[in-house]
Amino acid sequence: MSDDRKAIKRALISVYDKTGLEDLAQALHRENVEIVSTGSTAAKIAELGIPVTPVEELTGFPECLEGRVKTLHPKVHAGILADTRKEDHLRQLKELEVAPFQLVVVNLYPFAETVASGADFDACVEQIDIGGPSMVRAAAKNHPSVAVVVSPNRYEDVQEALKTGGFSRAERTKLAAEAFRHTATYDVTVATWMSEQLAAEDSETEFPGWIGTTNTLSRSLRYGENPHQSAALYVGNIRGLAQAKQFHGKEMSYNNYTDSDAAWRAAWDHERPCVAIIKHANPCGIAVSDESIAAAHREAHACDSVSAFGGVIASNREVSVEMANQVAEIFTEVIIAPSYEEGAVEILSQKKNIRILQAEAPVRKGFESREISGGLLVQERDLIHAEGDNSANWTLAAGSAVSPEVLKDLEFAWTAVRSVKSNAILLAKNGATVGVGMGQVNRVDSARLAVDRAGAERATGSVAASDAFFPFADGFEVLAEAGITAVVQPGGSIRDNEVIEAANKAGVTMYLTGARHFAH
């Protein structure tokens, strides 16, 4: 593309967000740019003592319908859409007595913010902008002749362009792309909201008839899951791990993000102070402690200290100096927490490569999706909120009711097993995992792996959780032989009676939840 700068002689400004408007208007006025504006924007500019032409004066038609119609007029849109490279367009403008615009500055009604505020349906509908997107799209389409600006963050660029003879063709193209993304995001937000309103009234399904998402490129990553795969990070509208603040360390990798997401979610599954250590999206250890977050970290690390080497650590509480000193002794890829005690970051930063992140708590509602060939699978997030996740609703199927202390361990184990890839068996004792068997294609092998990871001493007297039912008694029998005292599992197998009989025979307490927590 050639430079092809277009000097800015005439500008159309219509903004809901008045941030930076004063400086922008003054800069345009200094360069003798004619300003046409609407409603409250025109009033604000006039208050500054800057000449401004109200749009109704331009069109000869008054603003009407409570402001719904202001700029939807040929006198406005012809000035935006005229391709000044074409003699025929210039001739028609002259015949119609319409002057072209070289700059259009528009931002839109705050629809998303209105929805987020809890406003009623009619109030939200009133914030659906019509004229604004029309002007933005028109200017973006005609970027060979017009520069379009949709964010106050670009006002300094406008001031610079005024000094250099206008925006270049390449700059106008970039601004046009931003503008189309802006209106696309706006339309997706409106369409998604409308679909959700309809779904809420549909007795047959809770899912909207249309799903749209918008994500913006944050940065390219060094590579993907493997070095031969390219990768990038895109961010959405909901704040979370992707927007985490990094205090120290190398750039986050693709695998760092996937493991950190698993760790962050695992830690926040628990209401008590919790630390989760994750490797390849599976727990090396999870622990809770009312004593201190440092104690939780010690117990989580003790579960599988070998696998924890090079893992990701997530804490659902502030990282203390004591915990930071412990982590600093271990090779760790990432540590993530909601906050850090004064001095903790400095201690952790002594390790050159550790990535230290601070993030907001993960969203505890909504849906999650997974791409498949030709489509998208969408499901409600598994948030440990099923009826069977409450121990008050468990059924005692075998053995005697356990003590409050043992029940607390069973509750912990049941919550923790959600974060383990299926088939999953998790052993726990005193609020900490002691053995985890994950990702096996049969449950008996997961049981063997969990027992093997725990070792005979730690397995004895521990409790166990299974993410799904035991299809045969053999998986349970592995646990019973290892000295497990109580088991919590969903139940629902056609061989439940055989499994329960085996539990009674072994003298092991068994609770059935009626809820399942597969994770694939």
Swiss-Prot record:
Q: In which pathway does it act?
A: Purine metabolism; IMP biosynthesis via de novo pathway; 5-formamido-1-(5-phospho-D-ribosyl)imidazole-4-carboxamide from 5-amino-1-(5-phospho-D-ribosyl)imidazole-4-carboxamide (10-formyl THF route): step 1/1; Purine metabolism; IMP biosynthesis via de novo pathway; IMP from 5-formamido-1-(5-phospho-D-ribosyl)imidazole-4-carboxamide: step 1/1
Task: Give one Pfam hit by family name.
Answer: MGS
Keyword Hydrolase listed: yes
Domain (MGS-like) spans 1-150
Which of UniProt's keywords are assigned here? Hydrolase, Multifunctional enzyme, Purine biosynthesis, Transferase
Catalytic activity, EC: 2.1.2.3, 3.5.4.10
- Quote the SMART domains the UniProt record gives: AICARFT_IMPCHas (SM00798), MGS (SM00851)
Hydrolase in keyword set: yes
Q: Which GO terms describe its molecular function?
A: IMP cyclohydrolase activity; phosphoribosylaminoimidazolecarboxamide formyltransferase activity
InterPro entries the UniProt entry points to:
AICAR_Tfase_dup_dom_sf (IPR024051), Cytidine_deaminase-like (IPR016193), MGS-like_dom (IPR011607), MGS-like_dom_sf (IPR036914), PurH-like (IPR002695)
Gene Ontology CC: one annotated term:
cytosol
PROSITE patterns linked? MGS
In terms of HAMAP family, this protein maps to: PurH
Q: Write out the domain note.
A: The IMP cyclohydrolase activity resides in the N-terminal region.
Please report the name of this protein according to its UniProt entry. Answer: Bifunctional purine biosynthesis protein PurH
According to its UniProt entry, this protein's organism is Corynebacterium glutamicum (strain R)
Which gene does this sequence derive from? purH
